[in-house]
Amino acid sequence: MIRVATAECFTHGKVAREIHAFSMGYPLNYNWKISAELVLVAGLFIPTLSGVRNILGFEPPMPRATINDIKVYGEEEDEEVALMMARAVRELADSDIGIGTTAGIGRGGIAIASRDRWDVINSEVHADLRYPDTERILERQKSGIQRALQLLESFIVDFKDR
């Protein structure tokens, strides 16, 4: 059984929902290409700086902007923070794999971390949370969910091959 935990911002906990539904035998929107025994240990939606500090237990870098305590980073910082989130939630939930997502300005950061491997990618859609364009924000979210689950599948294949 592979244990997975998520700490999500721009994907709004939807990566966790997809993983849980798949693990229980009723996949939602994602077309899974693997067969693996997974369990979602925890799925956290953490868009704020205070959530990162108080729940994930680390001090995040200073964002370019904040909107009601919601962190707004550039793409490079999003990648860094997503990896920090993935590592922190993996430790917090005592899981095999942690997933972190965050997006402010740009394509966002999507990170997956195990004890000995990590990777960071982006969505395929650029958006800017400071000047919300609902359609672009939702397109970026959809792309981020898809890309996170694809990356998880590659991790699981590698995990099972060990």
Curated annotation (Swiss-Prot):
Q: Which domain of life is it from?
A: Archaea
InterPro entries referenced in this protein's UniProt entry, alphabetically: HcgF
Sequence similarity? Belongs to the UPF0254 family.
Q: What is this protein called?
A: UPF0254 protein MTH1148 homolog
What species is given as this protein's source?
A: Methanothermobacter thermautotrophicus (strain Winter) (Methanobacterium thermoautotrophicum)
Lineage runs: Archaea, Methanobacteriati, Methanobacteriota, Methanomada group, Methanobacteria
